[in-house]
């Protein structure tokens, strides 16, 4: 169904988009580091909450992408467009609700999640959280539209929009932080403006009726409960999985925040830099939703396996190069962030250990996207949620508080989480039970 040229056309823009996202994330942290470690720490704490929200919205978009991909596999573009309208409606309403909660509960939520943190860190976190919350509805629109274009195998639209969004963000950061000396607000305001621009651009483009999947030109999205249920059947388990994953990271971040500013800053910078190692798997995972979803929709189970195996091999090939480069360059890269010697030492150690452990990651996080594309979302959710609470959270507290391993204990617990997921997902994949055993029309909940 997909030639290697088709796969390259889908995956290369996705990888570029992921690179852009990581580079902009790095630029944010580097620029705000000029304000001080308290600013870096405040932004890092808020980013862990924002990532939870973003992953929740992304899971809903994934549900829509799976439904649309399976309809396209069955050559049913009409229902694919109906699903697109309902996806846009659902994600926007959810994002507005989340924004209101975040704006109203600003300081209370931060205090509830992270407990007693230093006053200057809290002040920076409050400012950044407020501005981040305003951007959530725009980001939801962008994510939903990007997912729709990926389901068509057209990822160029989202990467071009992402390029525009990130350019606005970086230029805005430089102007507001270095030129206007606005501190953390100088990072937050360009985030709002850039995400608003991206959301509006994608909303204009996705209304084009010439595209295989499109939404109503006048945004008369309608209300189709059955179609929304189809999307939620995929999106809710994926959302619970992603939300629990990010909630676990927040709880771990709360644990790290008790270790002092140097540990928070070192942990934040290490997390920022190792994002490069996630790039191929994240992009390939997004591509799997399209490729495997269409194969399953068309009933081509053998091809679904074939493409999954091929994409995992590509993931490992790119990852090997990135891991070697990041390990070799870890010290000079950390030096960019203007950290204290203690924080720099922590960051370098975390990066080196992380690079070796990444051999587990593709099977733990890229492979389950193939299962989700085949609607096998309950298994991935149960496995991920159990692993998160047992290993990433539970073991982190044991290693940090019981064995006094500091932030390295958090890293070790994370690797244990990866290993458990990888074993169960690999067994599930090899068994073939992730593939639907019923007529394909049921795969999208008709």
Q: Model segments located where?
A:
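Small-residue-rich hydrophobic transmembrane alpha-helices
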Residues: 40-100, 139-158, 264-330, 361-384
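Helix-terminus/linker motif at the lipid-water interface of multi-pass membrane proteins
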Residues: 23-41, 110-119, 175-182, 243-276, ...
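N-terminal transmembrane alpha-helices
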Residues: 2-30, 34-35, 51-63, 92-99, ...
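Short alpha-helical transmembrane segments in multi-pass integral membrane proteins
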Residues: 1-14, 68-135, 168, 177-236, ...
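Residue-level hotspots within the lipid-embedded alpha helices of multi-pass solute transporters
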Residues: 18-22, 55, 95, 99, ...
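Interfacial/gating helices of multi-pass transporter permease domains
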Residues: 32-51, 119-127, 184-185, 226-234, ...
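Transmembrane helical elements of multi-pass membrane transporters/channels
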Residues: 9-25, 131, 165, 194-198, ...
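Short runs within selected transmembrane alpha-helices of multi-pass transporters and secretion channels
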Residues: 61, 131-150, 158-166, 187-202, ...
């Amino acid at each position: 169904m997909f030639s290697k040229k088709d796969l390259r056309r889908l995956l290369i823009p996705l990888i570029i988009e992921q690179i852009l996202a990581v580079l902009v994330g790095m630029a944010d942290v580097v620029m705000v580091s000029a304000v001080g470690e308290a600013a870096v720490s405040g932004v890092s704490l808020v980013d862990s909450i924002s990532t939870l929200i973003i992953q929740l919205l992304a899971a809903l978009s994934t549900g829509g992408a799976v439904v649309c991909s399976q309809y396209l596999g069955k050559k049913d573009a009409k229902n694919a467009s109906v699903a697109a309208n309902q996806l846009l409606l659902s994600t926007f309403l959810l994002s507005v609700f989340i924004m209101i909660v975040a704006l109203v509960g600003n300081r209370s939520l931060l205090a509830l999640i992270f407990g007693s943190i230093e006053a200057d860190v809290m002040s920076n976190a409050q400012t950044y959280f407020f501005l981040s919350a305003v951007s959530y509805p725009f980001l939801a629109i962008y994510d939903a539209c990007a997912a729709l274009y990926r389901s068509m195998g057209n990822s160029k639209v989202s990467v071009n929009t992402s390029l525009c969004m990130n350019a606005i963000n970086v230029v805005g950061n430089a102007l507001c932080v270095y030129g206007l000396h606005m501190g953390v607000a100088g990072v937050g305001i360009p985030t709002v403006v850039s995400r608003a621009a991206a959301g509006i651009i994608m909303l204009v483009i996705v209304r084009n009726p010439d595209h295989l999947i499109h939404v109503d030109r006048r945004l008369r999205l309608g209300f189709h409960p059955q179609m929304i249920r189809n999307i939620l059947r995929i999106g809710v388990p994926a959302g619970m999985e992603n939300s629990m994953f990010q909630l676990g990271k927040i709880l771990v971040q709360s644990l790290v925040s008790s270790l002092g500013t140097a540990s928070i800053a070192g942990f934040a910078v290490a997390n920022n830099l190792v994002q490069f190692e996630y790039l191929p798997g994240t992009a390939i995972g997004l591509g799997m939703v399209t490729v495997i979803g269409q194969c399953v929709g068309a009933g081509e189970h053998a091809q679904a396996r074939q493409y999954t195996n091929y994409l995992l091999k590509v993931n490992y090939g790119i990852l090997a190069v990135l891991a070697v480069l990041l390990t070799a360059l870890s010290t000079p890269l950390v030096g960019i962030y203007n950290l204290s010697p203690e924080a720099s030492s922590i960051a370098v150690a975390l990066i080196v250990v992380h690079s070796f452990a990444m051999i587990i990651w593709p099977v733990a996080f890229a492979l389950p996207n193939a299962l989700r594309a085949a609607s096998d979302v309950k298994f991935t959710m149960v496995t991920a949620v159990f692993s998160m609470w047992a290993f990433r959270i539970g073991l982190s507290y044991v290693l940090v508080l019981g064995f006094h391993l500091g932030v390295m204990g958090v890293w070790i617990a994370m690797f244990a989480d990866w290993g458990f997921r990888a074993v169960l997902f690999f067994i599930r994949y090899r068994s073939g039970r992730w593939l639907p055993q019923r007529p394909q029309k049921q795969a999208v909940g008709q």
